[in-house]
C-alpha cells in the first residue's frame, strides 16, 4: 500500500486516503498529512471549484499549510521565551527583503520531499507551484536582504527575536526597460494577498505627528512635558513567522501598516462631501504605501521622516506593552529583556522616541530613562557615504516632531557637556560632534543621535569599521572606544546555496555531508578534492547546468541568447556611481574597440550580465543603465564582435531571479571605489557558489581575499589610502584620459554617438562627468582594471586551474555565513542566548 493514495488531480473531488492517519493535517510533517492540509485549504481557504484550480491556487494552499506548521512552532517559541524570561533581540529595519518564502520554509522545515510527494499525488509539479510566488516588495537592496538573512540565522541559532519594519503596500518599484531606459512600474505585490502574514488588528498603536509640546506641573508638583499631536494615525501589526532550519524555533517579523484613526467620516458623507468622508483614511494609509518615497520634493522628505517615526513608535510601544504583560518585570528591566538593534540610521529616531515614552508617559526621570535607553540600543552603521548619513532640516523636524526636538536638544546639551569635560577648549570638536548640525541650514544628524544613544556601535566589515573609527565617527570613537566593534556581514547558506543551487547542494552533501547547512566552515572539507579530476568535472557540470538555466531566463527576459560555455561575467547590485557599473562598461567598449580595430584578434568568449535598479530620482545612475543597454544593442548585433562578447541587462533584479544569477557566475564584479562600500553581501553570495572575484580592496572584499588567498582573487585598483592621497593632490581625471590612448578612444566612441545611433547628447553628461569630475575615480582605476581583466581571460583558458580556484572560493567561504555574524552580535552586543523549543 502506498503512503499517499493517488487522488484526482483537483485534490478536491475525493479526499486523500493516506495509509497513516496518525498525523494531524494542521501539524503533521509527512506527505500524507500535508496532502490532506492542501486539500482542506483548497476547499475551505481558497474556495475554488475543482475545475477552476490552477498552480497559483495550489501555491496558496501549500503556503497556508506550511504556515500552519510554522505557527505551531511560533506559539511554542513565544511561550517558551515568556515562561523562561529570556532576553529577546528586536531588529528595527526600514527594509526586509525576504524573497519568496515557500521554498525557504519547506527547506527549513525539512519538508521539501513531503511537499513534492503530496503535490505529485495531486497532479501538480512543485517547481511550477513555487514559481507562482510573488516577490515581497519590502526592501531595496543589500540592507533589506541582510536583515532577512539575520532573521533566518537568529531562528536557526535558536535565539528569540522579533523583526520590526513597515508593511509597504507597493514596496519597491518593478523595473522595466524601455528603449534602454529604466521605467518604474507599480509593484503591486499584495494584489492577491499574502498567505504568510497574519493580520493582528487587536495589536495597534496610536502614532502622533505635528502639533506642539506642552509643559505642565502635575499633582505632585513635578514639572512634566507632553506632546499634543496635530494629527494621529494608527499602526496595525501584521505578523509573518520566521522558521529556523532544522529546529523548532520560529520567530516573527512584525510589520506595521498605517490606518486612519477614524476611517470614515459619516457626517461629511451625509452632507455630500464624499472625499472628505475618506480623506483621513487616504492620507494616513499613504504612510506605508511605498518604500523610500522620492525625497527631492519637500513632501517626499516629510513622508520619509513620518515613515521612520511611524514604524519606530509602533515597535517601541509594542515592546513596552510586552514588558507590561510580564509579571516579573517592569519597564526598568527593559535592557535585561530586550536588545534593540538599529539597522542603519533609518530607525535612529528611536532614541528620542523611547526617551519620550519613558519620561512623558511612564514618568521616569531623565537620568534613569537615559540609562535605560543607552543600555537598550545598539547601532549598526552601513555606510560611509555622506548622503546616506541621514540629516533632517531643523525647521521641518520641529514642525513634525516638536517634542522629539526638545528631547534631542537636551540630549545634545548633556552630551556636549561630557565632550567639554573630556576635551576642554576644543570648540571644533564640539561642532563636529553636535547632534544639531550648524553648517549652513541647521539640521538634525541622525547618525550622531544613534551613536550617542547606543551602548554599542558597529561597522559591517573590518575595513569599514576601521574607516568609521578613523573618519566618519572618529570623534565618537575617541570619546567612547569601548563602544565600537566590527561585525562583518554574512549571508544565509540555506537560501543562497542550498535553495538557489540544488545541483551544488547535492554535490556538497555527497562529498562532505550536509552539516555545512548550519556550519559553513565544514566546506573546508572540499579542499582535498581540489586535486581530484573526477570531482572537478562534477563541479564544472554543476556550474554549466546553472549557466544553462540562467541563459534560458536571460533569453526569455531580454531576448539575448547566451552560450553556457562562455565565461559568465556578472555584476548585479543597486546602480550607483560608487559601485562603478560604468567602469565595467568601459572595459566592454574597450574589447569592442579592439575587435573592431583588429578583425584577426581572438579573445576568450565572455557574456557580460548586469542587473540592478537605480533610484527613481538618480539621474546619473539611470543614464548608466541606458549606456549598458545601448552598448548591449550595438555589441549583440555586430557579427564582428558578438562571437566573442555579448551583453545583457536583466530587468527587475530581485531575490527570486538572484537564485538563478549567483549560481551561474564564473566571475563576480565587486569593483567599487576603495573606501566606499561598507561591506557588500552580493560578493559573498557569488563566493559561496564558486565564482571568482575581480575587485578592489573595499568592504568585505578585503576579508574574502584574506580567506581564499590572493592567488584566487583578481585584485586591481587604488587602495583606500591611495584614493585619499590622489584626491589630496588634486585629482584631475583628464590627465588619466590623456595618458591612456585606449581610455580616450573608449570615451570618444561614447561621445560621438557610436552606441546611441549618432545622438551625441544622450551620454554627454556621463562623459563630461568622467573627464572633468569623476568623483569615484573611474579613470584613475581604468588601466589597472583592464589589465586585471586581461589576466582573467588568460586564467579562464586554463579550465582545470580555474575550477580549482572556484572550488577553493566555496571551500573557504565559511566566515561569510550570517550564522557567524549573528552569533557574534548575540555574544558581544545583545547577550541573547539559545533557547530550545519543543513542540
Q: What role is predicted for each listed range?
A:
Residues 2-839:
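A conserved ligand/cofactor-binding region detector
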